[in-house]
């Protein structure tokens, strides 16, 4: 628990649910049955939860107001397709996301983030999508699909739809695969390669919680995809 998902929710030791931010979510009967069953793969999984008893997603506008929608993922994906910038709460902090094929919005993100030249990384749905944009060696594929989910620099294909504004004047593109369920859902629903860059203004610390993100990123993001 020195790093990774557990580190982002633990507040004290030992690593038990009452010592994590999951303590405020009471398990429903189905989740509790899984948790108590030694034969279940979720036996004593401290963050065990489901859509009925676990954390909830919420979409907010740039001022932090709730956006009414029956499907948060579908609405957020549509906004990305429309060229909006969304601050997404991930593991340990926020990311700023936009359509990596849209030069206008990528340039706007650079302007708002005050990062005019440094290359940006993208996230794509899977290894097949990666190969549409980059030449991928066997070693690079192993790195991409490893549990660490690193950003891997790979040679950019000339016919890639990822716009040049992502990494101006460079032959290599930084690519990562989804490493949380939320990322997987967004990438699947949007069918886009997405710029994923740290949720901060250049040289500032990354935003960690909802209130801080709304306060510091309201001039950078058009919407916020958060959870409780």
Residue spans of the language-model regions?
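Active-site-adjacent structural elements in enzyme catalytic cores
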Residues: 1-228
């Amino acid at each position: 628990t020195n790093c990774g998902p557990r580190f982002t929710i633990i507040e004290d030791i030992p690593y038990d649910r009452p010592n994590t931010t999951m303590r405020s979510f009471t398990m429903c009967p189905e989740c509790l049955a899984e948790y108590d069953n030694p034969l279940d793969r979720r036996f004593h999984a401290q963050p065990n939860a489901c859509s009925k008893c676990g954390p909830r997603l919420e979409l907010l506008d740039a001022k932090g107001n709730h956006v009414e929608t029956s499907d948060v993922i579908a609405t957020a994906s549509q906004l990305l397709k429309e060229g909006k910038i969304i601050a997404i709460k991930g593991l340990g902090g926020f990311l700023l996301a936009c359509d990596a094929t849209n030069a206008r919005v990528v340039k706007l993100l650079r302007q708002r983030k005050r990062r005019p030249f440094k290359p940006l990384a993208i996230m794509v749905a899977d290894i097949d999508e990666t190969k549409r944009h980059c030449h991928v060696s066997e070693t690079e594929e192993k790195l991409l699909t490893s549990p660490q989910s690193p950003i891997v620099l790979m040679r950019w294909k000339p016919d890639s739809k990822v716009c040049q504004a992502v990494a101006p004047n460079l032959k290599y593109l930084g690519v990562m695969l989804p490493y949380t369920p939320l990322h997987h859902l967004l990438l699947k629903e949007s069918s886009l390669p997405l710029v994923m860059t740290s949720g901060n203004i250049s040289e500032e610390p990354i935003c960690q919680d909802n209130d801080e993100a709304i306060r510091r990123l309201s001039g950078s993001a058009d919407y916020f995809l958060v959870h409780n």
